[in-house]
Amino acid sequence: MGTSMRHVREIFLAAALMAPFAVSAQDRQSDPKAFSLRERIPQEQWIRVRNLNGAVHVRAATGDQVEVTATRTWRRGDPKSVRIESRKSSDGSILVCALWTEDTVCTEDRYSNNDRGRRNRDDDNRNDVAVDFEIRVPKGVKVGVWTVNGAATVDGVTSEVRASTVNGSVEATSAGGPVQASTVNGSVHAKMGRLDGDQDLSFSSVNGSVVAEFTGDIDADIDLSTVNGSFQTDWPVTITGRIDPRHLRATLGKGGRRIHLSTVNGNVELRKR
C-alpha cells in the first residue's frame, strides 16, 4: 500500500546482501568494542547509521558530542569479515555503515552492490555476524537510522528523525520533529512534540500496527489505510471523498501537510499526546 517499486527493489537488494542470518542468541560470541566514534556534529546536521543485521538504538547524549558504539555478535561467522566504516561530510554530517561484503557500497541514501566479488557470495551467505549499534545524540542533531533485521528505536532527541527496518519494530520519539518511520514486518510507533514547517509525514508497515502521536492540535490532510484492521483518530475529522472501510481521507483542522499512515495487517491510529 503506497510502497514504491524503488522501495521494493531496495528491500530485495538488502535481503540479497545480508544472507539468512537468523540464529539463536544462545552460544553466540560477542565483541563489544567493534567500533567507537565520538564527534561533534553541528545542530541541524545529521548522524546517519546504516545496518543490515542487528538493532539500532538511539538515545540522548549527556554532552555535546555524538557517540556511536557497535557490538558484533556471531556463532559460526567471521566477525572480521564485517567492517564498520564512517565518513564526515563537508556540512559536518556523519555516516556510519556496517558492511558485510567487499563489493557493498554504502551512501547516505542506500546500500548498493557493484557486483564485484560474487565468487565470495556463498561464504557471505553463511555469515551470521550481527552488529548492534548504540547511538547517543545531543540536542539539535538530526537522526537517520536504517536496518534490515532488527529493531530501530529512537528516544530523547529533539530534531528530525528518519527510522526504518524490514524485519522488526520501529519506535521513534522526538521532542521536535518531524518523524518518518517504516517497517515491513513489525509495528511502528512514532511520537512528536512541536511540528514545525509543512513537510509531509509518512508512517508505514505491512504486517503490524501503525501509531502516530502528536502534541496539541494540528492542521493536516490525513490519509489512513489498512486492509485487515481498523482506524482510530483522537481528533474530529472532516471526511473527504467516499467512505471506505479500508481507506480514510480526511481533514484535521484547517488542513495542510499530508500525513500518511498505512499497513496491510494491523490497526492505524492517530493519537493526541
Question: What do these predicted ranges mean?
Answer:
Residues G2-R273:
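Intrinsically disordered, low-complexity terminal regions
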